[in-house]
């Protein structure tokens, strides 16, 4: 069934249309990818879904219009996100950093048992008492994903989770994302520049350019579509070989 639906969504900053009459659907239990050139409006779409900006059009979650709701209400409804640059709490331990997420979730309060489960799930058990500021890049990414999972989301939105990662770290994060989807049954939306990551992880891929939808289809069809190659994949064909 359709879990999230964007209907004719438009966002202007002055005269610039960052998102231009964009419509798409995300089905429950799936991994949905969003890609496009730099400045295509991908992160703006995330900011609209999670209540950071007002906009024209509608966004529906579980059939309910969430347009215009503040971010904390959207988090409580079951939508969690991460950011391109890991947002950590340098003065807190890993355990406390993940606990912060549980306070903002649907349950509306700290759940130590759930926090423990999340720490184990994202494989930060050994770092539990460590200061978050001392984590390496992979650890910080896992912490941010863990804090989002602690909210008990129905949708987890990942914004370029592989940014800055080496091949081994990318493999590690891809495994974690697959487990979140398959083992926890959480629907995932992922923005990513690495097309190989998107073709391996996602079941549906949306390509946008200048805030407009170019194509939404299964990854194999998307990467071979001439419109997509022209707008986005011109320099990335080598990555697919």
Describe the residue ranges of each PLM region:
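Glycine-rich phosphate-binding loops of nucleotide-dependent enzymes
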Residues: 1-240
């Amino acid at each position: 069934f359709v879990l999230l639906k964007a209907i004719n969504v438009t966002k202007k900053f002055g005269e610039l249309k960052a998102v231009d009459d964009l419509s798409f659907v995300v089905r429950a239990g799936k991994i949905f990818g969003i890609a496009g050139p730099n400045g295509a409006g991908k992160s703006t779409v995330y900011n609209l879904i999670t209540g950071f900006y007002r906009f024209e059009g509608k966004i529906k979650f579980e059939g309910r219009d969430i347009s215009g709701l503040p971010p904390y209400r959207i988090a409580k409804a079951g939508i969690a996100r991460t950011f391109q640059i890991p947002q950590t709490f340098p003065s807190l331990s890993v355990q406390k950093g993940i606990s912060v997420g549980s306070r903002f979730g649907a349950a509306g309060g700290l759940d130590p048992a759930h926090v423990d489960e999340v720490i184990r799930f994202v494989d930060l058990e050994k770092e539990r008492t460590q200061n978050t500021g001392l984590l390496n890049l992979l650890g910080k990414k896992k912490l941010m994903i863990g804090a989002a999972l602690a909210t008990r989301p129905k949708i987890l939105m990942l914004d370029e989770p592989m940014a800055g990662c080496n091949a081994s770290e990318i493999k590690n994060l891809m495994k974690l994302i697959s487990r979140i989807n398959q083992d926890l049954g959480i629907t995932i939306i992922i923005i990513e520049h690495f097309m190989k990551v998107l073709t391996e992880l996602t079941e549906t891929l949306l390509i946008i350019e200048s805030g407009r939808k170019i194509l939404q289809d299964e990854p194999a069809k998307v990467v071979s579509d001439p419109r997509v190659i022209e707008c986005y994949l011109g320099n990335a064909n080598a990555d697919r070989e």
